[in-house]
Swiss-Prot record:
Keywords: Hydrolase. Homotetramer. It comes from Corynebacterium efficiens (strain DSM 44549 / YS-314 / AJ 12310 / JCM 11189 / NBRC 100395). Transmembrane segments: none annotated. The gene is glsA. This is Glutaminase.
């Protein structure tokens, strides 16, 4: 039998998600940075990286943009890794502020910024990196190099944008002066804001951000290089802070509806992390009144619903989706187990893509699957359809009637068998 490599349907699904939100032109690009104000508002991208290093992308996922506030959790990770939690916690708190990202939100008793996801906290965190005696350039190079290691490639800084941004950084300068007055930072206010602005000006793509967030999802191990860049405890601290404060004064609604740690930036980037499983990133420049990307938020809502991403869900993957693949005469039986959310279905797809099938028949045994999420159902059936289109006779063994239908995406239907060996 002539067979062909199976292809992955995930990018096709991502393209559908992008098309579903592309017509939404509400919101506006950031107005206070000239390059962002004049930027094309139409690029749209979605990228994902699993903790196993599988990367998927759609749309303008190779389009470069500056990180802006999306840089905050990664700089926070570097400060925690370098200086230790005790020193960092003495400088910046962990509580959500409930205020806009550029408010001077300080703890009333300690004068610490409320959290590292607002500008006051991010400026303070930036000043911890490479030590208080560091020059601006040495500190910024430490940050750029660390971000590059997280992304798995060399990243560059948009110096032209940072120069323009610093010219209009009056509010951040006033925040830095206040932090210096309270003894939170030691650098000259201008140098502190310059260092922070250069941090925000590191250029990335959505694919870069997906890999960077997947590193946090993997407990600090970079999924492409295998390098340990963040201690597991540090990764937990960063993700916890993203969950409580990453989406500014929209954080509570975000956690309730989407349910994963996330961080947005005014250039249009938005990242999210499903611990232990994957990192996600979108790019769409138009922002809502809270400063979060309009279409990015809608994409994450759709992904959370379809893929079963919510942290409070009881169905998150705890075991390998493929229990066994057995050759029984001329029939290959693929046994699945556990709840079929996106991560489980992706595990199934990668397993069958690499498998060298023998014989002429393939039966998918889902007797140990208690439920399917919409995206899990779609990916599993699409994978089976592509096995069929590769020349095999296929069927599904579903004694508990877990699947509501056996329809494939091309309008055909998979047969059902009462015994895995009867096909």
């Amino acid at each position: 039998m002539t067979t062909h490599p199976l292809t992955m349907p995930i990018p096709e699904y991502f393209e559908e998600i992008l098309e579903s939100v592309r017509s939404d032109v509400s919101g506006e690009v950031a107005q206070y940075i000239p390059q962002l104000k004049d930027a094309d508002p139409n690029p749209l991208a979605l990228a994902m990286c699993t903790v196993d290093g599988h990367i998927y992308g759609a749309g303008d996922d190779e389009h470069e943009f500056t990180m802006q506030s999306v840089s905050k959790p990664f700089a926070y990770a570097l400060a925690l890794q370098e200086q230790g939690p005790e020193k960092v916690f003495a400088t910046v708190g962990l509580e959500p502020s409930g205020e806009a990202f550029n408010e001077l939100s300080l703890d009333g008793s300690t004068n610490r910024p409320m959290n590292p996801m607002i500008n006051a906290g991010a400026i303070a965190v930036n000043q911890l990196i490479n030590g208080s005696e560091s020059s601006v350039e040495d500190r910024v190079e430490k940050i750029r190099s660390y971000f590059s290691a997280l992304a798995g490639r060399e990243l560059n800084i948009d110096r032209q944008l940072s120069e323009t941004e610093i010219e209009g950084a009056d509010r951040n300068l006033s925040i830095a002066h206040m932090l210096r007055n309270y003894g939170i930072i030691e650098d000259d206010a201008h140098d502190a804001v310059l260092s922070y602005t250069l941090q925000c000006s590191v250029k990335v793509t959505a694919r870069d951000l997906a890999v960077m967030t997947a590193t946090l999802a993997a407990g600090g191990t970079q999924p492409l290089t295998g390098e340990k860049l963040v201690d597991a405890r540090v990764a937990r601290l960063v993700l916890s802070t993203m969950a409580s404060a990453g989406m500014y004064d929209e954080a509570g609604q975000w956690l309730a509806t989407v349910g994963i740690p996330a961080k947005s930036g005014v250039s249009g980037g938005l990242v999210g992390v499903l611990p232990g499983q994957l990192g996600l990133a979108t790019f769409s420049p138009r922002l809502n009144s809270q400063g979060n990307p309009v279409r990015g938020v809608e994409i994450f809502k759709a992904l959370s619903e379809d893929m079963g991403l919510h942290l409070m869900s009881a169905e998150l993957l705890t075991q390998h989706a493929v229990r066994a693949i057995e050759e029984r005469g001329d029939t290959t039986v693929i046994q699945l187990q556990g709840a079929m959310n996106f991560s489980a279905a992706e595990n199934f797809l990668f397993t069958v893509t690499d498998h060298d099938f023998t014989g002429e028949k393939v039966v998918l045994d889902i007797s140990r699957v208690p439920m399917f999420r919409p995206m899990g159902r779609r990916l599993v059936k699409e994978g089976l359809r592509r096995i069929r289109d590769n020349g095999f006779k296929v069927a599904i063994y579903d004694p508990e009637d877990i699947l509501p239908d056996f329809d494939f995406s091309d309008g055909t239907k998979s047969p059902q068998v009462d015994d895995p060996e009867e096909l």
